[in-house]
Curated annotation (Swiss-Prot):
SMART domains noted in UniProt: TPR (SM00028)
Native source species: Arabidopsis thaliana
TPR repeat locations: 118-151, 152-185, 226-259, 261-293
Superkingdom of this protein's organism: Eukaryota
Transit peptide location: 1-39
GO cellular component assignments: chloroplast; chloroplast envelope; cytosol; plastid
This protein's name: protein SLOW GREEN 1, chloroplastic
UniProt subcellular location: Plastid, Chloroplast
Gene3D superfamilies in alphabetical order: Tetratricopeptide repeat domain (1.25.40.10)
Keyword Zinc: no
Amino acid sequence: MISSLSASSSLVSSFVAVKATPVTGPLIPRRDLLSIRIRASSNQNSSGYCFPEKFKSFAKSAILIGAAVSMTGKFSTLPVKAESPVTTIEKTYEEVKEEKLSEITPLSELLDSTPEAVETLRSLLQQKLEKGEDEEALKLLERLVAAQPEETEWKFLMARLLGEMGRPENARQMFEEILQRNPLSFEALFENALLMDRSGEGNAVLQRLEDALAVAEAEYLVKEARDVRLIIAQIHFLQKNVDEALKSYEQLTKEDPKDFRPYFCRGMIYSLLDKNVEAKEQFAKYRELSPKKFEVEGYLRTPLSKMKLFGGSEEN
């Protein structure tokens, strides 16, 4: 039986990371590495508080649903840490810290000429984040972004880290840079929308998404248009416009009954509403349609969410 989310956050944490093979094609462009960092916060265990309070307590579930909906591309789990000894990692990092971006040995040249350097720095970055050394991680990311401005993976990592460090405006600026290159990037649109909504720009965020939808429709990008509509539905839910969100998911299901994502989202919403019978029906349909290898992995329990390798077919 689907248990009520008003009693526990365990169901919420169980649907954060998703592995899957594409259903209707890769949802987002391929990126070599992506990190979603969310620190778990304790939720109220009382089931007696009113509907608005319940949504306030579980507002972060909107992030959860969006993450699950977005990650329908093929990707693997946490990469094996670099086999290089710690001393080698630290040595490379010291070289990066001491490197003055001179004409002789700029960091970009080091990364281009030394294949192991990127993986070594990636492993070091992961260590810094896991230890909560945010400032050190940010400094490293700033250098990586400057050295490899075309690599959106570093910008995604940096944006998410800035958001968690309480610097939403800087995070949004980074997402905007990503969107300048790929205006229909699902994750950049979604996460930027979340930041806008948290900043009290409720109407502006919906207009921003409507503009993105118009771009997709004007270019006859059916898949991208559908993805933006999924984000819009999610924002409606986040803004407590539950009926509108459910209506949107229902319309998306009518247009493509084989897409499991709207079923998943409706199941999550019904769970939040303690409508367990309806939630069970939606989750059953979602499991029926999702790929056989589709997995849901809870990793919200860790202080730092995992780094992942994406293996889609599209390029940014």
